[in-house]
Amino acid sequence: MATPYVTDETGGKYIASTQRPDGTWRKQRRVKEGYVPQEEVPVYENKYVKFFKSKPELPPGLSPEATAPITASRPEGGEPALSKTAKRNLKRKEKRRQQQEKGEAEALSRTLEKVSLGETAQVPSAPQASRAAPTAASDQPDSAATTEKAKKIKNLKKKLRQVEELQQRIQAGEISQPSKEQLEKLARRRALEEELEDLELGL
């Protein structure tokens, strides 16, 4: 919004008096020669911004008419050009999907072969298949339990290391009066060592 100026008979410029929202009037203010109001001051642009604004969108020598058919020929709803990374990710997803389908197809063909072998072969293979299914299912909980044990072992080792550091600091005289918590930590050392041994034997 431009500031309304009023010029008097002597040629002096004034900012016209305006009414405030509460109904009172602001006085008109004299403006010095060459004054530019804040809202009319152009925004500063460094040389790089100016360069990129002045830079044409098309390469030199290429007319805008030549580019119009290319943009029009692109199908509506067509995907924009993908970056190299996006293309690579799409290929990976596609490959994974194909491998998964391939694996499912192979498993299906194996089960069909077992079924088509005949009645005599089918009877003993049925318990084997039922035995194989629980072992495959039990592998996952085993691996989860193993990782859980590994985490516990790591945590216990860390606690033992802290207890040892605390004991060394007390022996070196860095801590003259250990707090109640620190004494409890030292007392728990044997229990931590036993728990760690049990877990390591369980693995």
Curated annotation (Swiss-Prot):
Residues bearing the modification Phosphoserine: 63, 116
A Gene Ontology biological process term: nuclear-transcribed mRNA catabolic process, nonsense-mediated decay
One GO cellular component term noted in the UniProt record for this chain: cytoplasm
Amino acid composition bias (Basic and acidic residues), ranges on this chain: 97-113
Gene Ontology terms, MF aspect: ribosome binding; RNA binding
Chain coiled-coil ranges: 81-116, 144-203
Record PANTHER family: PARTNER OF Y14 AND MAGO, PYM PROTEIN
Subunit record text: Interacts (via N-terminus) with MAGOH and RBM8A; the interaction is direct. Associates (eIF2A-like region) with the 40S ribosomal subunit and the 48S preinitiation complex.
Name of the protein: Partner of Y14 and mago
